[in-house]
């Protein structure tokens, strides 16, 4: 199954959600993109995700031109929050995004996706 995660910038919540969804099942191919992609991912995000053993070092935010005409089975409109200013705030956002991604994943299973 191919899932597209959409956020505004693809610099914070989108990459986190995509990483968690990929982690939940090896049968899910996940791509995240932003409507107005940033130049880079927030460095605090990389540190917070590393604590979950997920490496986003070097991730480059993508836009619609990067995704192109790829086909997706499902689009996940990820809740997009402002990027936190401290590592502790980033951890709280990470945990929120992880929970939201898990609920989305459970919904896919419930509807036989």
Protein language model features and the residues they cover:
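A general structural motif
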Residues: 27, 71-72
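Conserved active-site segments centered on acidic
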Residues: 1-65
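Short amphipathic alpha-helix with an adjacent loop that forms part of the alpha/beta core around
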Residues: 66-70
């Amino acid at each position: 199954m191919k899932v597209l995660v959409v956020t505004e910038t693809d610099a914070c919540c989108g990459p986190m959600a995509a990483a968690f969804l990929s982690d939940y099942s090896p049968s899910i191919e996940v791509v995240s993109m932003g409507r107005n992609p940033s130049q880079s991912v927030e460095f605090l995000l990389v540190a917070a995700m590393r604590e979950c053993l997920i490496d986003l070092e070097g991730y480059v935010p993508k836009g619609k031109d990067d995704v192109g005409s790829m086909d997706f089975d499902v689009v996940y409109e990820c809740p997009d929050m402002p990027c936190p200013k401290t590592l502790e705030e980033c951890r709280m956002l990470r945990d929120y995004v992880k929970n939201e991604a898990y609920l989305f994943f459970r919904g896919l299973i419930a509807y036989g996706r």
